[in-house]
């Protein structure tokens, strides 16, 4: 009965309250996508466990948080900012909150790290990594090889030259690191926090296409045709630029 009530709460479109969420050791759990705001009475992620936050969730309030060793809260990239408020809790060494951007594709540019606002109140932490780096740019496309030339013939004569290879495409630009606001008590030790807000790496340059081989020579009864030259290789594309780094605003209360 309790499990049924919990499932009903999780999938309610309203703000949720008094829900208990537990992620098993080495387990992965994805929150539902039906609500934009989630209130959790107790959230426990065991060692090496991962809780996935969907893109449509914009606010999560946790009354009691327990992050085990190397546990992770992974927040999907999105245009909307995400706010996390924790009233009390314990965070073990190696735990992290990840809000990295997405890698680019040939059709879509890389996505930046998600804008975050995090408030930790009565929280004891051994260490915490906040990773909100930008997504890496997609690599440039490889240029096509040139077609081979036609061999010489006794009927049509001279061999044809190989076709030139195409140039490689340019890599896409990496996305920016996130904009982060941290609200921490005055006695919270800043040295337990590690924040990574680097911009994403630029995409690799596309490789050049090779030139096609020239047509071969042909020996005929009355004469011989000469072979033709090879096509020229294309040019290697340019590597994409790295994305700009994000920034962090630390507020003590």
Regions found by a protein language model. Give the residues of each.
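N-terminal domain-start segments of secreted/luminal proteins
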Residues: 17-93
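Active-site scaffold segments
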Residues: 179-183
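A short, structured loop/turn motif at beta-sheet edges
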Residues: 90-92, 119-128, 184-192
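Sec-dependent signal peptide recognition
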Residues: 1-7
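N-terminal signal peptide c-region/cleavage motif recognized by signal peptidases
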Residues: 12-14
């Amino acid at each position: 009965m309790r499990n049924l009530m919990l499932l009903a709460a999780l999938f309610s479109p309203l703000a949720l309250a008094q829900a208990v969420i537990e992620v098993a050791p080495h387990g992965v759990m994805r929150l539902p996508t039906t609500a934009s705001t989630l209130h959790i009475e107790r959230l426990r992620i065991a060692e090496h466990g991962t809780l996935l936050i969907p893109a449509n969730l914009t606010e999560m309030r946790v009354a009691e948080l327990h992050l085990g060793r190397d546990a992770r809260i992974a927040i999907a990239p999105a245009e909307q900012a995400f706010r996390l408020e924790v009233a009390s809790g314990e965070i073990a060494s190696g735990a992290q909150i990840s809000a990295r951007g997405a890698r680019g594709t040939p059709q879509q540019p890389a996505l930046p790290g998600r804008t975050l606002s995090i408030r930790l109140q009565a929280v004891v932490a051994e260490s915490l990594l906040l990773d909100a780096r930008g997504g890496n740019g997609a690599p440039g496309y490889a240029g096509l090889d040139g077609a081979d030339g036609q061999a010489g013939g006794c009927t049509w004569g001279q061999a044809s030259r190989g076709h030139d290879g195409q140039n490689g495409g340019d890599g896409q630009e990496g996305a920016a690191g996130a904009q982060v606001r941290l609200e921490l008590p005055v006695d919270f030790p800043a040295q337990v926090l590690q924040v990574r807000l680097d911009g994403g790496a630029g995409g690799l340059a596309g490789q050049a296409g090779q030139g096609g081989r020239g047509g071969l020579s042909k020996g005929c009864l009355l004469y011989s045709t000469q072979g033709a030259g090879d096509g020229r290789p294309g040019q290697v594309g340019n590597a994409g630029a790295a994305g700009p780094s994000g920034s962090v605003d630390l507020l003590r209360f």
